[in-house]
């Protein structure tokens, strides 16, 4: 009899066979599930603390997605030959898994929960993110933790006007859409996508298609729980302190109402801090007078937050102005300035209300491309977008250093929004880096990065296919009443039920990200949100087009210029030289950057046109073929008894025999030639071994004959 209580569920999911198993591996975790999708295998584990830490006032969920190089049959690079800090892809996938799971834990559950997913085996054609999300959901479901799942997930492509479920990597290359959707049986919770200017109808159809198809995975998880799940935790939320809620409401409600009449963010924040402090102080006085212990500040803060949420939500649903005085459809005032930094290649300052992004574009060569060593193989990225939000952007102090998960995620969203509108490498051979520095933030800084990024690229002279703008939408839903909010503020994001970011052009959507905090968002509500987002996006695009009609026709004087030279691929080694000696000397002496592709295309880049011309000339000389009948101005390298060695081109010498110097007999070659002397010679013979014979007297004879016939000699 086996020592394992192993449970396996298999199902066909689109073009792939999926296997879920639990009960054999990682049995000491609260829950553990292995997911196998056509040889891409992940182990998802969950551990939940049995009790919350004293004073805990938030839900401490961590999700770590870890790729092991052995899964692809590789040994890690680096001195230690082991996996190090998470890659950008691992960080983004961790966020992708976290986002649909977090809303499904019950309110008031503050026990620490850690979800860890290890990628154990990789089929290069099957991305591991969907198996990882399914595995994390299944591990939570079998663990017995209080979790309102399970969650399903699916990737959707759009190929030849048809949706494709969980496409392979090859299929994705031919797709105009890469969309990941996650949700429960009843509702969509998360969407992440990149698209090639698709309509809102196609995008919504993909979300609905993915939600329908994920039900197969959800059913399989239910079966796994039925046969291999652990007993459900006996957890109940702490009873609400109705007396405290009533007293806090009595003390603070009117002051909170007054605070939310202030339209300026900083004034409003200052007033809210006063209300919080005054309420806590009054409660401490009450406790002292009654001889009891006052409620801790975290508990009081949660009650105050709930009152704030009710105030803001009810005002919006009743048709009253929003926090900053706008109606539900108005975009905040926009100011645009380009060329703001004198020596950068392209720059823009994009301000929308109290959100501001200073965005800079830099052009580089092929050598500046990012080399990514992924499990499925090494590849290069010619477009990079990095997002930074320092603490001063929100008027706070804090840590400054390497990017946090949020910054990496916002940068990737902005990159997704812009990448489909960039020119191809054939049309514009530069590598491109965009950096968005958020200098002010009050909602939707990632979408400000999209707008500013597009403007900075155009300022740098990048011929974008179209202007790209982004907008963040919000939602308030109570029963049958709902309101979709255009261009949400930070407070509206915290107090609302949905964060919905849409970026695109006049033609269609290029990126869509959706995070829904509640269940019950219908297709109709998403339809309204998408239509309202399009209205807002077109408004912003109008402002951007008025400010910058198109890309600059001239690159910055500080940007590198590029020219290309086509050489025989067999000559590449001559240009590179032994140990790179030739190309190294070329780049150092001409001040250029030189990249050579396998097909013989040489790209020369420099800010100096003279340096580029010199590098091009020398490369052409190195790769030139010596032809019989050609005349060269050569340099005497060495004198021999029977002639001279003459250098014609870099690395190419020929023999000028003593009998070919002049017509008369030469007794001493030193009477006619010296080492270092420039001499004009004609190629009279080459052989299969590459040996070259030269003649100077042939040119003398031609000159004499030409003089007699008045025909100019060969030059």
Swiss-Prot record:
GO terms for biological process: mRNA catabolic process; RNA processing. It comes from the Bacteria. It is an enzyme of class 2 (transferase). Mg(2+) binds at residues 493, 499. GO terms for molecular function: 3'-5'-RNA exonuclease activity; magnesium ion binding; polyribonucleotide nucleotidyltransferase activity; RNA binding. Residues 560-619 form the KH domain. Residues 629-697 form the S1 motif domain. SUPFAM superfamilies: Eukaryotic type KH-domain (KH-domain type I), Nucleic acid-binding proteins, Ribonuclease PH domain 2-like, Ribosomal protein S5 domain 2-like. Its cofactor is Mg(2+). PROSITE patterns: KH_TYPE_1 (PS50084), S1 (PS50126). It is found in: Cytoplasm. It catalyses: RNA(n+1) + phosphate = RNA(n) + a ribonucleoside 5'-diphosphate. Its main location: cytoplasm. Keywords: Cytoplasm, Magnesium, Metal-binding, Nucleotidyltransferase, RNA-binding, Transferase. GO terms for cellular component: cytosol. The keyword Ribosomal protein does not apply. Its EC number is 2.7.7.8. PANTHER family: POLYRIBONUCLEOTIDE NUCLEOTIDYLTRANSFERASE, POLYRIBONUCLEOTIDE NUCLEOTIDYLTRANSFERASE 1, MITOCHONDRIAL. Involved in mRNA degradation. Catalyzes the phosphorolysis of single-stranded polyribonucleotides processively in the 3'- to 5'-direction. Belongs to the polyribonucleotide nucleotidyltransferase family. This is Polyribonucleotide nucleotidyltransferase.
């Amino acid at each position: 009899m086996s020592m394992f209580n192993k449970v396996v569920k298999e199902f066909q999911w689109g073009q792939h066979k999926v296997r879920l198993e639990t009960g054999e591996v990682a049995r000491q975790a609260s829950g553990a599930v292995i997911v196998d999708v056509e040889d891409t295998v992940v182990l998802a584990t969950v551990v939940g603390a049995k009790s919350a830490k004293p004073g805990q006032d938030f839900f401490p969920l961590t999700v770590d997605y870890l790729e092991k190089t052995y899964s692809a049959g590789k040994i890690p690079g680096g001195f230690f030959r082991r996996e190090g800090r998470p890659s950008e892809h691992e960080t983004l996938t961790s966020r992708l898994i976290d986002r649909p799971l977090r809303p499904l834990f019950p309110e008031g559950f503050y026990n620490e929960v850690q979800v860890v997913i290890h990628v154990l085996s990789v089929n290069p054609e099957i991305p591991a993110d969907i198996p990882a999300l399914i595995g994390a959901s299944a591990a939570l479901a079998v663990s017995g933790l209080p979790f309102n799942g399970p969650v399903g997930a699916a990737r959707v492509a759009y190929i030849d006007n048809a949706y494709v479920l969980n496409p392979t990597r090859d299929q994705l290359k031919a797709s105009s859409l890469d969309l990941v959707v996650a949700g429960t049986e009843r509702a969509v919770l998360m969407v992440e996508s990149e698209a090639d200017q698709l309509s809102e109808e196609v995008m919504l159809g993909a979300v609905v298609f993915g939600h329908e198809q994920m039900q197969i995975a959800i059913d399989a998880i239910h079966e796994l729980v039925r046969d291999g799940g652990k007993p459900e935790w006996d957890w109940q939320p702490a009873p609400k302190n109705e007396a405290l809620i009533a007293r806090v409401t009595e003390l603070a409600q009117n002051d909170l109402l007054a605070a939310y009449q202030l339209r300026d963010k900083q004034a409003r924040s200052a007033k809210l801090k006063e209300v919080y402090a005054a309420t806590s102080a009054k409660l401490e006085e009450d406790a002292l007078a009654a001889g009891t212990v006052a409620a801790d500040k975290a508990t009081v803060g949660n009650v105050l937050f709930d009152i704030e949420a009710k105030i803001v939500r009810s005002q919006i649903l009743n048709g009253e102005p929003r926090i900053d005085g706008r109606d539900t459809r108005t975009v905040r005032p926009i100011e645009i300035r380009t060329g703001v930094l004198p020596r950068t290649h392209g720059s823009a300052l994009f301000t929308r209300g109290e959100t501001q992004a200073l965005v800079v574009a830099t052009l580089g060569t092929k050598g500046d491309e990012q080399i990514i060593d992924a499990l499925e193989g090494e590849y290069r990225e010619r477009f990079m977008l990095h997002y930074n939000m320092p603490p001063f952007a929100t008027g706070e102090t804090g840590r400054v250093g390497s990017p946090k998960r949020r910054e990496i995620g916002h940068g990737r969203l902005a990159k997704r929004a812009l990448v489909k509108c960039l020119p191809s490498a054939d049309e514009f051979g530069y590598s491109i880096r965009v950096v968005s520095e958020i200098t002010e933030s009050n909602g939707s800084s990632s979408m400000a990065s999209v707008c500013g990024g597009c403007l900075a690229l155009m300022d740098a002279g990048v011929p974008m296919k179209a202007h790209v703008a982004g907008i963040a939408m919000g939602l308030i839903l109570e029963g049958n009443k709902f309101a979709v909010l255009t261009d949400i503020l930070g407070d509206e994001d915290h107090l609302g039920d949905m964060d919905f970011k849409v970026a695109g052009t006049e033609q269609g959507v290029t990126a869509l990200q959706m995070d829904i905090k509640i269940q019950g968002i219908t297709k109709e509500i998403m339809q309204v949100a998408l239509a309202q987002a399009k209205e807002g996006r077109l408004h912003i695009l109008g402002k951007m087009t008025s400010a910058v009609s198109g890309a600059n026709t001239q690159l910055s004087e500080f940007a590198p210029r590029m020219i290309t030279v086509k050489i025989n691929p067999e000559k590449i080694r001559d240009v590179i030289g032994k140990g790179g000696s030739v190309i190294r000397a070329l780049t150092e002496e001409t001040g250029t950057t030189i990249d050579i592709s396998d097909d013989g295309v040489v790209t020369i880049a420099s800010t100096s046109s003279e340096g580029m011309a010199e590098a091009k000339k020398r490369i052409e000389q190195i790769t030139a073929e010596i032809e019989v009948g050609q005349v060269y101005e050569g340099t005497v390298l060495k004198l021999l008894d029977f002639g001279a060695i003459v250098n014609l081109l870099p690395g190419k010498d020929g023999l000028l025999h003593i009998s070919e110097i002049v017509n008369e007999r030469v007794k001493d070659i030193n009477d006619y030639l010296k080492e270092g002397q420039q001499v004009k010679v004609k190629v009279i013979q080459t052989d299969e071994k590459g040996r070259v014979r030269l003649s100077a007297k042939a040119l003398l004879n031609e000159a004499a004959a030409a003089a007699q016939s008045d025909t100019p000699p060969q030059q």
